[in-house]
């Protein structure tokens, strides 16, 4: 092998290694990324069972039903649409009806029930993501300005 051929082989091997590393990183991210949806988004274009997502909105008024132990069922709404959520675990102290919430989990196969792995309660509307706040304002359910007065 000439010097030029060796250099070309090293460059080609390095490029192959970098391409493999990039593909592995992209694959790892695609397996762990959870996209954010609101109930209205899922009403327009449903997500298949088993897909990890984040579901956000407000806890529906009168929707909290406690089961045995730490089981709880409630609905998440954006003012126009609502999705039933089932969670088995300890809820955050700030979790209550009408409060902002973000849940992460998957839809139950053959059902329209969202099974949450984690539940995050929003402390205050001031800390709500802009996309959620904009949607709630558009739907007329925003309580941010009144809550601070």
Swiss-Prot record:
The keyword Coiled coil does not apply. It comes from the Bacteria. GO terms for biological process: cytochrome complex assembly. It holds the Pfam family CcmE. Its main location: membrane. Residues 29-149 are periplasmic. The chain crosses the membrane at residues 8-28. Heme binds at residues 123, 127. It is found in: Cell inner membrane. One of its GO terms (molecular function) is metal ion binding. Residues 1-7 are cytoplasmic. Keywords: Cell inner membrane, Cell membrane, Cytochrome c-type biogenesis, Heme, Iron, Membrane, Metal-binding, Signal-anchor, Transmembrane, Transmembrane helix. GO terms for cellular component: plasma membrane. It is a single-pass type II membrane protein. InterPro entries: CcmE, CcmE-like_sf, NA-bd_OB-fold. Heme chaperone required for the biogenesis of c-type cytochromes. Transiently binds heme delivered by CcmC and transfers the heme to apo-cytochromes in a process facilitated by CcmF and CcmH. Belongs to the CcmE/CycJ family. PANTHER family: CYTOCHROME C-TYPE BIOGENESIS PROTEIN CCME HOMOLOG, MITOCHONDRIAL (PTHR34128:SF2). This is Cytochrome c-type biogenesis protein CcmE. It comes from Rhizobium rhizogenes (strain K84 / ATCC BAA-868).
